[in-house]
Amino acid sequence: MNQLHRRMGTFSLMMVGLGSMIGSGWLFGAWRAAQIAGPAAIISWVIGMVVILFIALSYSELGSMFPEAGGMVKYTQYSHGSFIGFIAGWANWIAIVSVIPVEAVASVQYMSSWPWEWAKWTSGLVKNGTLTGEGLAFASVLLLIYFLLNYWTVNLFSKANSLITIFKIIIPGLTIGALLFVGFHGENFTGGQSIAPNGWASVLTAVATSGIVFAFNGFQSPINMAGEAKNPGKSIPIAVVGSLFVATVIYVLLQIAFIGAVNPSDIAHGWSHLNFNSPFADLAIALNINWLVIVLYADAFVSPSGTGITYTATTSRMIYGMEKNKYMPSIFGKLHPIYGVPRQAMFFNLIVSFIFLFLFRGWGVLAEIISVATLISYITGPITVMTLRRTGKDLYRPLRLKGLNVIAPLGFIFASLVLYWARWPLTGQVLFIILIGLPIYFYYQAKAKWKGFGRNFKAGVWMVFYLLAMMVISYLGSDKFGGLNVIHYGWDMVLIAMVSLVFYVWALKSGYQTEYLKDAKEINSQLLNGQSEAAAGKE
């Protein structure tokens, strides 16, 4: 069996997107953003949404054109061949698979600060912001639970995720209302200081490193589940954009409530000194909102677990998709004959999740790595969708975006800027993690006797030079972003925009009608035939 079951409607797919976005990001993101940017963290969330929206629009057109499992790791291969397709797919998979352990870490970290006398033992689960041996054991159990809920069928996943996501929307809503009503301090938004007490550069850094990009990363989950969508042409764009907007409203309101609820004395020496183990629960305890404390500690399991369950599903489809691209062993392309899920891919991702869990035991470190790896994978979306407008003119497009010739380059530039805002040396460190995957690509190229390698490498080499250019600019850039200050603040971002535009043009000209585009056309024609049959059935 090698065909996935199409059972998910628009609502289920939107819940997948929301379920991916409202995880540990809401439990920790507002605190980290406020710590970095102060009250201006509200602006950071809006900037982050705009950046991700421009990227998501490109992927929405692609997702509606090619409704297949693990689509996010396949699209670039259709437009530029296997070399850059592998880099983008590998970066995307690294970013997504590492979300699974970070959600487990978040649950255990909240658990470590349980205030009840009978639960004092939980304080030993976390020391200095990282999990202890006992903490790792609890997190490992959570990983197994995520795995088992996806093991049998997509129906079980879909039902469990929709229920969990509804719960995850209600709890942030209750938190927002309670904090605004009981303990709102309007002076926290100015307090005699600038709204951006740490400078406007910190507002930009917060977008990249506080968990904002990490939180919005879930927009791609409906795209990766497109192979199981009943009507992907309609469902994918609605699910992607709809879940992004709903999540933004929730996150902005949470940020406002968090900033207003902090005791002014706690920020007397600056927002950077604000330290919490369980941010919203700690605020609820300080304000004596006892019912909210209990609800938040319960949600600290539900929200991250819901996201962990979602990503366990989507990452298995990504490995399934990478096998179809000939980047992974054929065993990962097999589906269970009854349940229609890629179990071997799920086992592989479970092992990788354990590796990430034991190597990176803190939420903050994992969130930063995920954010930068995500940005590297995102930059190919605008390139691919515009290239296919030229090389795949005959493809059926259920969603054909107007103004894409403006949206796509802006999305590419915005993603480049956020990558730069992540600060040196983090940008260089994550780039190294991405490059680790190249030996896998070269191994499978050698097995194929380097067939077509020259053309594929030529079409994708711009990506290598782009990443190197970003590294150099980050290293020499403003000291506000961790650089040597050879390129001063302001001019550094102008340079990033100009360099990005040059690489954008180079990338578009590098695209060609790849051999993989034939497979894409087959998927696309099946979509057209399916919609034609559905229309005929209504008559």
Curated annotation (Swiss-Prot):
Membrane protein topology class: Multi-pass membrane protein
Key word Repressor present in the record?
no
Keyword annotations of the record: Amino-acid transport, Cell membrane, Membrane, Symport, Transmembrane, Transmembrane helix, Transport
UniProt key word Disulfide bond: no
Its transmembrane ranges are 11-31, 36-56, 82-102, 137-157, 164-184, 199-219, 238-258, 283-303, 350-370, 401-421, 424-444, 457-477, 486-506
Give the observed phenotype of the deletion mutant.
Loss of the gene confers resistance to both serine and its toxic analog serine hydroxamate. Deletion mutant is still able to transport serine, but the deletion of the three permease-encoding genes aimA (ybeC), ybxG and bcaP results in an unprecedented resistance to serine up to 100 mM.
Q: Which InterPro entries match?
A: AA/rel_permease1, AA_Transporter_AGT
Q: Which GO terms describe its biological process?
A: amino acid transport
Kindly report the protein's main subcellular placement as a broad class.
membrane
Induction summary: In the presence of glutamate in the medium, the expression is reduced five-fold, at high potassium concentration (5 mM). In the absence of glutamate, expression does not respond to the supply of potassium.
Q: Which GO cellular component terms are attached?
A: plasma membrane
> What molecular functions are annotated in GO for this chain?
symporter activity
Any idea where this protein resides?
A: Cell membrane
Similarity section? Belongs to the amino acid-polyamine-organocation (APC) superfamily. AGT (TC 2.A.3.11) family.
| UniProt function note | Major glutamate and serine transporter. Cannot transport threonine. AimA is the major glutamate transporter under standard growth conditions when glutamate is not limiting in the medium.
For this protein, the record's PANTHER family field holds:
ASPARTATE-PROTON SYMPORTER, PTHR47547
Q: What protein is this chain from?
A: Glutamate/serine transporter AimA
Q: What is the organism of origin for this protein?
A: Bacillus subtilis (strain 168)
